[in-house]
Regions:
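C-terminal regulatory/interaction regions
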Residues: 255-260, 269-282
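Conserved residues at the C-terminal ends of beta-strands
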Residues: 35, 104, 162, 202, ...
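Extended substrate/RNA-proximal surfaces in nucleic-acid metabolism proteins
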Residues: 53-194, 279-282
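Hydrophobic residues within beta-strands of alpha/beta enzymes
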Residues: 32-34, 101, 159, 199, ...
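Active-site-adjacent C-terminal substructures of enzyme catalytic domains
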Residues: 179-243, 253
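An N-terminally biased module of ancient metal coordination in phosphate/nucleic-acid-related enzymes
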Residues: 1-83, 88, 93-95, 99, ...
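Conserved, mostly hydrophobic/aromatic
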Residues: 5, 24, 101, 161, ...
């Protein structure tokens, strides 16, 4: 068992590094990783604020790395990509003891402004109207184009919540099955596969009742299976009781779609993790 997408009080998590690691040990996970939000170039309440604090974050993980006997602890980051603004992902790899990087888009750029898609729905709606003139197709296209640019130029180990642009959509603006959206998502997933980047299936929207499906949703599982795209289960946990949130449900949905194994970055494990493994229980 594993869980690599997890946050602490260094960013917007609710629990400390020590508390999150202790929880992973109690769940007897084989691999547990912390992936704090890397600093972004503007003041906010959700990311690690700066490089100095990032160094403290990695030092704190190192302090508790050997907290438990049976769980291997990994230190990662969830890095945002904003062309021309965010630091290159190589900065985090070069300057910190970063085991892996999750590449995610939370801010969609357009004409010098940035649409924050991960806050309250009012901000989502307001940003869509103010930054994209209410044009959901232009906004969705910009999101996926920015994601593909990140994959091409930054080469993260893992692609984070890749259809999160639909988080506050809830059928109001665009149908996830609209060929316009599906083509953009499939293009993004194909590029991830070509770049050997693992696609996370993120459960946070479900257990937080923020979304009706995973990121990306079940509607794309058949395509992932057909194209043999490597996937990883992810909780995006911000508290100790979330680190394997809805993993049992996700495991069953993956198996139902014919996906029989998941993957971790090669620096953690080069072998697929079978969903039929009796140890793979939650």
């Amino acid at each position: 068992m594993y869980s690599l997408h997890n946050h602490t009080t260094f960013c917007d998590g609710k629990k400390t590094v020590k508390e999150m690691i202790e929880s992973a040990c109690r769940e007897n996970l084989e691999h547990f990783g912390l992936s704090g939000h890397a600093p972004v170039p503007y003041e906010n309440k959700w990311s690690i604020p700066d490089d100095e604090k990032t160094a403290e974050y990695f030092a704190e993980i190192e302090k508790y790395r050997h907290q438990c006997e049976n769980t291997i602890i990994w230190s990662g980051l969830e890095a945002d990509y904003i062309a021309g603004l965010s630091k290159p992902f190589s900065h985090w790899r070069k300057n910190f003891n970063c085991s892996y990087l999750i590449g995610s888009i939370h801010l969609v750029a357009n004409a010098g402004q940035h649409w924050f898609i991960d806050g309250p729905s009012e901000g989502y709606d307001g940003g869509l109207n103010d930054i994209f003139g209410g044009d959901i197709r232009a906004a969705v296209k910009a999101y996926y184009r920015q994601t593909c640019e990140m994959l091409e130029t930054q080469n993260p180990d893992i692609l984070g919540h890749c259809d999160k642009v639909l988080m506050h959509n809830r059928g109001r603006y665009i149908d996830f099955a609209d060929p316009f959206h599906l083509d953009l998502l499939k293009e993004t997933l194909q590029l991830a596969a070509e770049k050997n980047i693992i696609v996370e299936i993120n459960t946070r929207g479900i257990y937080r009742n923020l979304h009706t499906d995973y990121y990306p949703g079940k509607y794309i599982f058949g395509f992932l299976k057909e194209k043999n795209i490597r996937v990883m289960m992810s909780a995006d946990a911000h508290d100790t009781d979330q680190i394997t949130g809805e993993f049992s449900r996700l495991k069953n949905d993956l198996l139902e779609a014919g996906i029989k194994e998941t993957w971790l970055p090669p620096q953690i494990s080069t072998d697929p993790i079978s969903l039929f493994n009796p140890d793979f229980q939650f």
